């Protein structure tokens, strides 16, 4: 996987990125439920006749308004049904990649027959929780995912417990590669990016390949709010400048348009989110192309962006009231700043300005409008880089921004982890009242 002679800390960084930067087809909250249903169906004796599911309030929030790839339908019920009838139980976040037209038709028929139910799990102390129970007559199989979008903790059928994660942990499971991030700094991450052998991080170029393809699909104008395609038209009409800033926003938002609109192309995700992966990737790719960067420079910039985004998000709940496109864009700001001048001071100033700019953006569930927030975050990231290049940034005398970038990040994450919990409850209450 990598050179065993590498610095052990660098090995952990690479493992963390490989753990958190993965292909994902469809918005990852509905996909998490689809995966639970697919794994349950694989354990069931006989074809699935009925699906019951329970999810955490946060997962419900992120599943109410997003299109499930290939179906033209929004919401968790179609995700659960298609996972059960057409999902690949071994494909992780790409669980629906092999779903056939017949499976989609069967899933819609199951919904129409009233054989699929999705409810909020009560009580639920988990931020990310999905459980799917599939039935064939009196026989059933049930799968529970907790904590991470693919983190299966329990598999049970009508006659036995097939798997429970607690048993594995008791036998001595290895420490998560993300643990190292709680003991590191942005300065150490930058040193890694500057010095690690290119061969060890070449794999990160796959994020550019996948997300550029998604962006190109989004520019067709068929998906979501077609923000990218619309802004591109306005450039042609002379209402928007054809410049680097516009290109960053257009190509980044186009990928999110396709992602949230249900395109059947995978995104390279970051921290369990396709939009975070898009936001950490596309601005860096556009700037790299502008400067004619070769594959090695692009890989280093992408590694800095993705690892910085993971580093920041690791201090947050997996799902929260804070729109995490903003924190992914902080990673993008780091990657873009590195491409332009590479100095730690520029990178840290850009991140500080981002925290002073878009830190209040809420997450009100996954939907087509996520592409609006992605475009805003990408634009803010480039603005922060331009300011930093002129030695200008939001200072430690202002708001939640501190004199030290590490403390600024900690302040933002404390806000999201604690004070914004009530915000999250209010958002979920508002969305639930609309659904009734």
From Swiss-Prot:
List the gene name.
Answer: yhaM
Q: Any stretches that span the bilayer, and where are they?
A: none
The organism is Shigella boydii serotype 4 (strain Sb227)
Q: Which PANTHER family match?
A: UPF0597 PROTEIN YHAM
Molecular function GO labels = L-cysteine desulfhydrase activity
- Paired cysteines (S-S): none
| Protein's name according to its UniProt entry | UPF0597 protein YhaM
Instruction: Please provide the Gene Ontology terms (biological process) for this protein.
Output: L-cysteine catabolic process to pyruvate
InterPro entries per the UniProt record, alphabetical: Ser_deHydtase-like_asu, UPF0597
Q: Which family does it belong to?
A: Belongs to the UPF0597 family.
């Amino acid at each position: 996987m990598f050179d065993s002679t590498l610095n052990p800390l660098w090995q952990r960084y690479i493992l963390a990125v490989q753990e958190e930067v993965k292909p994902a087809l469809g918005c990852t909250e509905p996909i998490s439920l689809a995966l639970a249903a697919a794994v349950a169906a694989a354990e069931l004796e006989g074809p699935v006749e009925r699906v019951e599911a329970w999810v955490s309030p946060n997962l419900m929030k992120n599943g109410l308004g997003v299109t499930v790839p290939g179906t033209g339908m929004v919401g968790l019920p179609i995700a659960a049904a298609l996972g059960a009838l057409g999902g690949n139980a071994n494909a992780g976040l790409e669980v629906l990649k092999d779903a056939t037209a017949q499976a989609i038709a069967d899933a819609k028929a199951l919904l129409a027959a009233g054989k699929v139910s999705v409810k909020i799990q009560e009580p639920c102390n988990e931020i990310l929780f999905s459980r799917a129970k599939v039935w064939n007559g009196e026989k059933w199989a049930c799968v529970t995912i907790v904590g991470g979008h693919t983190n299966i903790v329990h598999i049970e059928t009508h006659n036995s417990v097939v798997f429970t994660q607690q048993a594995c942990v008791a036998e001595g499971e290895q420490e998560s590669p993300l643990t190292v991030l709680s003991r590191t700094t942005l300065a150490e991450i930058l040193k890694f990016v500057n010095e690690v052998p290119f061969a060890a991080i070449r794999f990160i170029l796959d994020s550019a390949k996948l997300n550029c393809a998604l962006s190109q699909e989004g520019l067709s104008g068929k998906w979501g709010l077609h923000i990218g395609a619309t802004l591109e038209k306005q450039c042609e009409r002379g209402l928007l400048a054809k410049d680097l800033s516009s290109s960053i926003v257009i190509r980044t938002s186009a990928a999110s348009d396709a992602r949230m609109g249900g395109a059947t192309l995978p995104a390279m995700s970051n921290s369990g989110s396709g939009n975070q992966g898009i936001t950490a990737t596309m601005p860096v790719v556009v700037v790299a192309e502008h400067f004619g960067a070769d594959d090695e420079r692009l890989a280093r910039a992408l590694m800095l962006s993705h690892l910085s985004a993971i580093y920041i998000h690791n201090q947050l709940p997996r799902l929260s009231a804070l729109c995490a496109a903003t924190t992914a864009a902080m990673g993008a700001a780091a990657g873009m700043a590195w491409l332009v001048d590479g100095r730690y001071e520029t990178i840290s100033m850009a991140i500080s300005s981002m925290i002073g700019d878009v830190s209040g953006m809420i997450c009100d569930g996954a939907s087509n409008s996520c592409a609006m927030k992605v475009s805003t975050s990408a634009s803010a990231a480039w603005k922060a880089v331009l300011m930093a290049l002129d030695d200008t940034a939001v200072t430690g005398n202002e708001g939640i921004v501190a004199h030290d970038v590490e403390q600024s990040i900690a302040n933002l994450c404390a806000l999201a982890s604690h004070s914004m919990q009530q915000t999250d409850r209010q958002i979920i209450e508002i969305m639930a009242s609309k659904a009734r």
